[in-house]
Amino acid sequence: ILIFEGIHALQPQLRQGLARSNFGIYIHPNTSYVDQDGRTLLDARDLRLTRRIIRDNLHRGTPPLGTMRMWKDVLRGELLYMKPSSGTADVFVNTSHDYEPFLYGAVITELLKQTQDPGENRETVDRLIESYRHFFPIGTELIPQSSLIQEFIGSK
């Protein structure tokens, strides 16, 4: 068994020469959260940004605007390196959890409200605050200690 992890793991150059029996798995959050009228409140990209903002703040001390400044490069890298090869995956695993917006809402809203002069990120800050207004908060004690979600809530 050979396991490659990371954004380049599905690149054809890495899989070249491996037996066709090799198995590619593409793992990412891929859920949009909608209201009862079918209006999207939060899409998968905003969930990913939320996860990053909270994680970077908790574990790296990066303020939300620092993460948002890097976000453009993250999306560019995704377009250049991940999207082209994601279609070669044998299986797609959606890592979104239905309860995530309820879990992150209060934290991300507080972080974003503390952001002074978001400048070019004003639209993103306002959109996220408005989106999370629709989700009531739930406590982190409901999340199992073994859950990968712990990376984003800092309970571990």
Model-derived segments and spans:
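Conserved NTP phosphate-binding and transfer environment spanning the P-loop NTPase/kinase superfamily
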Residues: 9-156
